[in-house]
Amino acid sequence: MTRRLRSTDPSLHRVCSVCRLLGVSKQAYYKHEDRSLFRLGLERFVVEFVREIRALDPGIGGNKLWHMYRQRFGERYSVGYNRFYDIIEQYGLKVRRRSRRARTTDSRHGLPLYPDLTREFVPSSPCRLVASDITYLPLNGSSRFCFLSLVTDCYSREIVGYSVGESLETRYPLEALEMALRRYEGEDLSRLIHHSDRGLQYASFAYTDLLKKHGVRISMTERGNPKDNAIAERVNGTIKNELLRGKSFQSVSEAREAVAKAVDFYNNMRPHWSIDGMTPVQASKCDGEISKRWTSYRDMAIKRAMADAGGAAALMQPAAAGCISASIQPI
C-alpha cells in the first residue's frame, strides 16, 4: 500500500507523510521494504539453484531438489516446502513425464533359467545383492535406439556397472558386469546374488559363466512382472527419464558421455529416499539396516516372516555408527 501511494507521484508523497497517513513508523516501513527485497532475492536464489541442479539432472523432482537445497544452505537461506514448490511452479520449472518404448527383453530362448533367490531376502550390507537390467535411449532424428545396461547394488543403490551399446548384444551387459566385479574387487563374492530378468543376454552362457567363475549366485525373475526386478527398473527410469531428460544424442558415443556424467551425479550427489536421504556412495560406506523415508511393505513382510522363523537377527544387523555422515568419495 505504501509503495503504491509513493509510486503515483513520489514528489507528493514523502515517506514521513505516507507513514503518518497509514499509521506506521518509518522504521516499520523500511523494515518491510528490506523484508520484501530479501524475499525477492531469496526467490531468485532458489531459481538459480534449481537451474544449476537441473543442468546436471533435468528430470529431478521437487522433493529431492528441496532436500538438496536444505542440505547445501541449511538455515542461512531458509525456504519452506510449500514456498519452494510455489517458486518452482511460478517459474515453469516443474517437469512432466513422457514415454517412448523399445523392446529390450526377449525371454523366448532355450537357455537354462535360474530360480528367484530374492523373494525373501533383504540385503544388510553392500555386495550382497545386485540387480541388472537393460533400457533404451533414443537417438536424435531417427527411430534408432542405443541400449543402456546397468548393474545396481540393492543395498546402497549405487550403480556399480554400466555400458552403452548400439545393439542388444550380450557384450554390453557383460561390460557392465565386468565393471561391477572390478568395483567389488577384494570382496567375498560368494555372498553376492546377481538378480535379473530372463532375457537372452542374462541367460547366455557367456554371462552366466562369468558369474559362476567368480562364485556369484544367479537369480532370475520367475514371471513377467517388472516388480520382480523393481530396483533395477527404478534406477533405469531415474537415469533415462530424470538425469537424461530432454537430452538428445546424435551418436552412441555422445550418449556414452552423457551416461557417464549422469551416473557420476546419481552416485555422488543425488539423495535417495530408500537410503535415508543419503547418496549411494555415502550408503556404500554403511553396514546394517538403513532407514527408508517411505514404507516398504515388502521389507516389513519379509522381516515378520523371518522373525516368526527366528531368523530376523541373521537377516538384519544393527546399523554402523556414524554411517549417515559418511563422506562422499568418487568411485
Q: What is the predicted role of each segment?
A:
Residues 153-154, 164-171:
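A short acidic/small-residue loop/turn micro-motif
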Residues 212-216, 238-331:
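C-terminal domain-tail junction helix/linker
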Residues 18-19, 29, 50, 65, ...:
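Mobile genetic element proteins and their domesticated derivatives, centered on retroelements
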Residues 59, 73-76, 122-124, 139-141, ...:
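Conserved, non-catalytic sequence blocks in retroelement Pol enzymes and Pol-derived host proteins
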Residues 1-12, 47, 51-56:
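Short, amphipathic alpha-helical "recognition" segments used to contact nucleic acids or chromatin
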Residues 19, 26-126, 225, 281-293:
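Basic, flexible linker segments flanking DNA-binding modules
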Residues 81-150, 175, 179, 183-184, ...:
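Mobile-element integrase/transposase regions
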Residues 104-107, 196-198, 204-209, 218-240, ...:
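RNase H-like two-metal-ion nuclease catalytic core shared by retroviral integrases
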